[in-house]
């Protein structure tokens, strides 16, 4: 069984890489407004917004990190970025979904998501 897994990993081009959990450097990034999203990013969000998701997309020298929290029963949610940093060999992204304040409660469902833009990098991305 173990040999089958190794063969499948080899055939599919996948690799396993150890990721160091030591923070090294902050990364410059921009939080985009919806009007600034590339068309493909908007399409990816629309296709995935009903469930929680984490996606990356690369276009024209930029890397887009997309985090969605799926359908929420009400509106008024916000997302706080806790950390965007470069670890030894990975980009680490940590966000927090913040519930609505009493005065912001709405009866309609919402689909909170966040799009971060940065210069393209080769490192894998870890969402937390």
Question: Can you name each region flagged by the protein language model?
Answer:
Residues 1-12:
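Sec-dependent bacterial lipoprotein signal peptides
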Residues 13-128:
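Exposed, flexible binding/inhibitory loops of compact, secreted disulfide-stabilized domains
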């Amino acid at each position: 069984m173990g040999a089958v897994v190794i063969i499948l990993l080899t055939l599919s081009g996948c690799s396993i890489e150890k990721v160091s959990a030591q923070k090294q450097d902050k990364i410059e990034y921009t939080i985009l407004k919806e009007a600034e999203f590339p068309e493909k990013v908007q399409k990816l969000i629309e296709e995935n917004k009903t469930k929680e998701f984490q996606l990356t997309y690369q276009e024209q020298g930029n890397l887009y990190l997309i985090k969605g929290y799926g359908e929420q029963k009400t509106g008024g949610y916000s997302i706080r970025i806790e950390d965007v940093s470069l670890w030894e060999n990975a980009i680490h992204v940590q966000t927090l979904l913040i519930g609505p304040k009493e005065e912001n409660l709405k009866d309609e469902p919402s689909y909170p998501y966040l799009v971060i833009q940065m210069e393209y990098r080769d490192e894998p991305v870890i969402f937390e």
